[in-house]
Amino acid sequence: MGKAKVSNAIIRRLPRYRRYLGYLQTKGIKKISSNELSEMIGYTASQIRQDLNTFGEFGQQGYGYEVDKLYREINKILGLDREYKTVVVGVGNLGQAITNYTYYYKIGFNIIGLFDVNPRIIGNVINDVEVLDCADLEDYVGREGIDIGIICVNRENAQQVADSLVAGGVRGIWNFAPIDLVVPEDVALESVHLSDSLHALSFMIKSKEEEGRDLHTAK
């Protein structure tokens, strides 16, 4: 009998738990209760306990959670106790920013390959990694055993890049192109549409302005 599928909502909450636990570690805090975590994070204590119990028993009733232990366990759950060979395809402003962001390397996402189609960029060295021609992407991915491809190209070329990554044997794709990619079921896909978040922020600003006008009118 296989493992029960973990809901997407729980998966989205786990990195937030990890982030707060990491903060507690920097403050030297050794244990914390679900109620205290609830006050910090904003989820209910029962929600936190339920999420964590999905993966096992990490706390003790009346004692709470050991911060260091829970942080390590969440790392294991998220697969952050290993390293991933990673390539970035599209080395414009976003691709360069991702390549130069040291945090990704600290948590095991080692960017060892960079690819672009621009002759003026090919051959450049960014963070000690040479930019290669996208024509060589599929062969490189297969030869080097790349785990993850990060797509930072325009929407017109994103699916072709994804196809090359899949053909080379990647296990996951982090997509920043403004398009919904099609990949096989056995390839993990996480798409980040940055403009969607900005649109949501715009809506929230507009809503608060309307609420303010309504309150002013009601007086």
State where each predicted segment sits.
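Glycine-rich Rossmann-fold phosphate-binding loop(s) that bind the pyrophosphate
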Residues: 91
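Extreme N-terminal segment that seeds HTH/winged-HTH DNA-binding domains in transcriptional regulators
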Residues: 1-30
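Phosphate-bearing ligand-interacting subdomains
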Residues: 17, 22-25, 129-219
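HTH-adjacent hinge/linker in prokaryotic transcriptional regulators
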Residues: 31, 35, 40-85
